[in-house]
């Protein structure tokens, strides 16, 4: 495990999981939201995002946290492992609501109730819009180890096993 992608629906716990992976493995984390979004909530183009992302991907070791389907193929070209957090929709919505008005280091602003409503709408449509494409794309890279995590408990269990493996 040297170059890790953590993907999944908003609110699935990607950032939490990525930070825990960093604690265990010592790998640096790149948050896609910090690359894509500006402090004023405007975003850059996906071409610009790919250009900003590429130097990180060329590094020997990393954890990249975030979805951004339009950049997934590029990220998969470099990844050794993918953690796909397939949490139940209700848990994802809960995760979104829990971070309202909370300072975070993975996004350049504090999310408001309005932001949460937009993310919840996106989350409700996630499976129909994105999930199948992501699963199909992952199959194009048989050498990448894909770890499917379907619950918060499953995530915690995996992280505990990894701690033992890394003697932490």
Give the residues covered by each predicted segment:
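Walker A/P-loop
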Residues: 15
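Walker A (P-loop) ATP-phosphate-binding motif of ABC ATPase nucleotide-binding domains
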Residues: 3
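NTP-dependent small-molecule kinase module
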Residues: 125-168
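The conserved Walker
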Residues: 10
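A glycine- and Lys/Arg-enriched "phosphate-lid" helix/loop adjacent to the NTP-binding pocket
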Residues: 87-130
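Conserved nucleotide-sensing/catalytic segment adjacent to the nucleotide-binding pocket
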Residues: 28-82
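Hydrophobic anchor at the beta1->P-loop junction of P-loop NTPases
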Residues: 6
């Amino acid at each position: 495990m040297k170059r890790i992608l953590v993907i999944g629906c908003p609110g699935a716990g990607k950032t939490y999981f990525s930070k825990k992976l960093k604690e265990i493995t010592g790998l640096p984390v790149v948050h896609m939201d910090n690359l894509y979004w500006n402090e004023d909530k405007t975003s850059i183009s996906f071409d610009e995002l790919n250009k900003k992302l590429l130097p990180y991907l060329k590094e020997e070791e990393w954890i990249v946290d975030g979805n951004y389907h339009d950049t997934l193929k590029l990220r998969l070209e470099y990844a050794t492992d993918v953690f796909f957090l397939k949490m139940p929709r209700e848990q994802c919505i809960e995760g979104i609501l829990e971070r309202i008005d909370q300072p975070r280091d993975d996004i350049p602003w504090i999310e408001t109730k309005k932001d949460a409503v937009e993310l919840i709408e996106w989350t409700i449509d996630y499976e129909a819009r994105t999930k199948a494409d992501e699963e199909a794309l992952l199959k194009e890279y048989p050498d990448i180890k894909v770890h499917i995590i379907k619950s918060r408990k499953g995530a915690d269990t995996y992280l505990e096993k990894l701690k033992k493996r890394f003697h932490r």
